[in-house]
Design a protein with these regions (language model features):
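Short glycine/proline- and aromatic-enriched beta-strand/turn motifs that initiate or cap beta-hairpins
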Residues: 22-64
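Outer-membrane beta-barrel transmembrane domain signature
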Residues: 132-208, 214-218, 234-236
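Short loop/turn motifs that connect adjacent beta-strands in outer-membrane beta-barrel proteins
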Residues: 22-24, 51-53, 78-90, 117-126, ...
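Outer-membrane beta-barrel "beta-signal"
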Residues: 224-236
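Cleavable N-terminal export/targeting peptides
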Residues: 1-25
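Membrane-embedded beta-strands of outer-membrane beta-barrel proteins
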Residues: 43, 71-73, 110-112, 151-155, ...
Length: 236
């Protein structure tokens, strides 16, 4: 599964906080995941409003039939967009899914997000600290361990006069996985995109090509893993 372009969510959230609350975005991403040997599609939607913003994404894995599904929906609450603390928002999130033979535990998150940006919005960043409830999680002794935490950092950088975008996220969270004897998980997915709407005559072609590199510890399996994926993204 691919994590969404949360950096895009951050960018649009910051724009909406700055008063441009009519901004909204949807995109479709297609990847070939060389590490897993499968294809992945991702649909994302972002929409701001007077009280904050809503974002969701849905992933499907294909190998070649649908072999997995995963989704997240997040709400940023910010009723104080005109105040001096509009950089702070309340974050609420749900995620869950399944693949062949098993299902991911439902996860419910809540916490605070700090967001920042450069004057021209070509550089954006955020840091979220969240409580994470994962019902049905137990440690090796059989004790329920549903109460956990997650820290998420997000960045987005647009450069080369808008031709290129470097974005991504880094997650660190606690989740007991008795089958592999681990308790903490780290994952980051830096993405690089070339934006083809900068080609002369292609201004209305909202296509980007590039990909991502998933780096994780104790996520796919115990230990460190690197999984590159080539992709294309259409924004509409």
């Amino acid at each position: 599964m691919n994590k969404p372009s949360i950096a895009a969510l951050l960018l649009f959230s910051l724009i909406s906080i700055s008063g441009m609350n009519k901004v909204q975005a949807q995109n479709l991403q297609l990847y070939y995941d060389a590490g897993r040997g499968c294809a992945t599609s991702t649909v994302e939607m972002f929409r701001p409003d007077a009280g904050g913003s809503t974002f969701f994404f849905i992933d499907f894995d294909y190998s070649p039939k649908v072999s997995g599904a995963y989704w997240e929906i997040a709400r940023e609450l910010n009723f104080w967009q005109d105040s001096k603390v509009n950089w702070l928002s309340v974050h609420l999130e749900y995620n869950g899914g399944l693949n062949v033979g098993t299902a991911f535990n439902n996860a419910f998150l809540g916490g605070l997000t700090y967001s920042g940006h450069s004057k021209d919005f070509t550089k954006t960043w955020s840091l979220s600290a969240m409580y994470k409830a994962i019902p049905g999680t137990f440690d090796a002794s059989g004790k329920c361990q549903m109460h956990n935490f997650q820290i998420t950092g997000v960045w987005g950088i647009e450069f080369a006069k808008g031709w290129c975008t470097f974005s991504g996220f880094a997650d660190f969270w606690r989740e007991h996985r008795t089958w592999q004897g681990t308790e903490f998980i780290f994952m980051t997915e830096p993405q690089f995109w070339v934006n083809l709407n900068k080609v002369k005559g292609w201004e209305n072609i909202h296509l980007s090509v590039g990909g991502e590199l998933e780096l994780s510890a104790n996520f796919v399996a115990k230990g460190f893993h690197a999984m590159p994926a080539a992709g294309a993204k259409w924004t509409f």
